[in-house]
Amino acid sequence: MLELLQRLIATPSFSREEGATAEIIEDVLQEAGVKVKRYGNNVVAWGGDASKPVLLLNSHHDTVRPGAGWTHDPHLPVTNDGKLFGLGSNDAGGALVMMLAAFLHFHNRTDLPMSLCFAATAEEEVSGENGMAMLTRDVFVERPINVAIIGEPTGMQMAIAEKGLMVLDCVARGRTGHAARNEGVNALYASLIDIEWFRTHRFERTSPVLGNVKMTVTQIEAGSQHNVVPDSCRFVVDVRVTDAYTNMEVLEEIQRHVACEITPRSMRLAPSSIPMDHPLVLAGIEMGLTTYGSPTMSDQSLLPPDVPSMKIGPGDSARSHTPDEWLGVQELEDGIETFIRLLETMMRRMV
């Protein structure tokens, strides 16, 4: 699997440009005798007894574009002192090849209590319409999944909940006038009332894993020149939604309390979680793995509603999107071994 990861690093796969890495993954599966189907740049394979509930093993093969600060070619896989350097090594190449290794380990087994679906998805880094969203829309409607494991760098600990995201474009309205006269209605002042509400409001329900819904005003714009009272003030609010609410519930509560016009850019990046008493979580706890709530987004947010899910994978999220990104070779080897054992332990608990 190390060689496969090196091939993936060496093949550019920026979001919406993942065709070449999709072909590599497809070829590896076909060479192992697995029937594969492509949906755009998503690669999907099924294994086990098709009549049984479905466990989804998913990770993404797209990457961000490299930023400044790299000391070598981001697409040249270099191993030094036990570290494999290269773009996508940590996010999320290691988790992807871990998922693939586990799928190949189990895919011919029909005696397991669950069947398997392996999905290497595109456009994760941009939450695109042609990644996990496409599979949810076009594939998992026909063949529903029952539980999902998303491969991301978590240090092989279990991220059992993930916040959703809404970005709100807000507009406070006023009436223009000359700043030298007592006229007009200043939209900037009107916006301050709502901005203060966003700063201080606390939602009633708290997630035991993710804590409170978090709202942050991140941008503001008003006025055209110094002597004109602004008739509109635009501001942006970043809302991180916990699994204690749906995105719609949070939006409706906001709309009840503020006077500004609100336009959500998207409602589809939903919070996600898995119950603490799920066999998958209990299996991890039995093995000594820890649980936590993740502040970062993944393809979990685009899964079908009500599908329990968690994130796990080798590597460290802090290394993602950084110059000289790397993954420990031993991290990868240990991760594959741990993940296969996690699935075996979960399956045993379900029998």
Q: What name fits each language-model region?
A:
Residues L55-C117:
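Active-site metal-coordination/substrate-binding segment of hydrolases
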Residues A50, F140-P144, D306:
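Glycine-rich phosphate-binding loop signature in dinucleotide/nucleotide-binding domains
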Residues R65, I160, V167-V351:
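Metal-dependent amide/peptide-bond hydrolase catalytic core
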Residues A92, L96-V167, V171, V351:
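Acidic/histidine-rich catalytic neighborhood of metal-dependent amide-processing enzymes
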Residues M1-P66, S232-V236, V250-R256, I262, ...:
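N-terminal helical capping/dimerization or prosegment-like subdomains
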Residues H61, E124, P153, A179, ...:
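Active-site metal-binding loops of divalent metal-dependent hydrolases
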Residues L55-L57, A119, I149, M310-I312:
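Hydrophobic/aromatic beta-strand patches that form the interior of the parallel beta-sheet core
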